[in-house]
Amino acid sequence: RSPERLDIMMRNRVEEARRMGMPLLIGEWGAFYGDARCVGAAAMMARFLAENTVGEFYWDYHRGIEQGAFFPSLSRPSPLRVGGFPVGIRMAESPGVMQVEWTEETAPAPASEFHLPDGWVMEEAPSGGKWTGAGTVSVPPAEKPGMRKVTLRPAS
């Protein structure tokens, strides 16, 4: 587990995407193969990916992957769409809290949607937030343009 090495690698990819004016998508990462020694590395990588990319694909499939010690790093919340301009995504390694901020510049803005895996909740549900099924929560736009923020966390 080398946070400095991973930080340099991610910083280089983020800078490259900015230079090209493109979103950053990580095509493939992973293959921890159920190794419990990889829990820290998986959590660190998941945090870097959540904060710096528009998406990624984890590569590894074997029976019982859900029982792998690193699986909580894969089964995490994610913004599916935000009704405005994304400002920031922060994912704490422990206890696994995700915060998503965005600016709604028009009124009414489109609704924002977030994927919540089993066992996750929206901490401060903006008024009118509702479950739409299949682990998705919908957050309606605010009445006036401005900064929005939601916190997603494991249920107590």
Task: Describe the function of each predicted region.
Residues 135-137:
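Short strand-edge motifs at loop-to-beta-strand transitions and within beta-strands
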Residues 36-128, 139-155:
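Aromatic-rich peripheral "rim/lid" segments of glycoside hydrolase catalytic domains that contact
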